[in-house]
Amino acid sequence: MHADVKYIIYDPISWIHPKRFSLPKKLATARCRSIINDIILHQYGLSTGDIDLSNSKENYLAHHWAVLAKAAFMAACHRYRSALAYNGLMFKLDPLTFQFTQCELTGSRDDFRGDITWGCLRFLAYRELMTFSSDVSLLMKERIPLLFEKQAEVNMSDSFILQQNDNEILVRMAIQYAKRNH
């Protein structure tokens, strides 16, 4: 098994979103990390089977695990760039995400002009990545939500929930863009 795959399966401390869990410095020893990783695996009910590297999408996700949350956020910002501009949030994006939103990859969701918040964008990023990951193993699907901070109840309109035909290309391009600039 590849080292990058092992850390996804057995070392959630190394990649879990810091708002879900942050390891205190006093517990940063190898023994403590091992125990806390076991607790996290149990607490979240994470399976410990094998990642199916013969599944090209699963292999792709494993290879780019470190940038998935950032790439998903970039994809959501790209898709809803019109709403971001309308609400004056475009220039509050980090430079990398702002630059990615300027690429002409997909059309913007111009049908939505309501209030869009950072929490809403995080939820949309999560949805982009879960849609992209629809045909991967349960082991991967269980771990993807942990890349994001715990999702609050978000009052979303139906315009956000529509399935996107261009999700595959948008997320792949965002991953490549994030990886190149990581």
Regions found by a protein language model. Name each.
Residues 1-182:
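General marker for long, soluble alpha-helical cores
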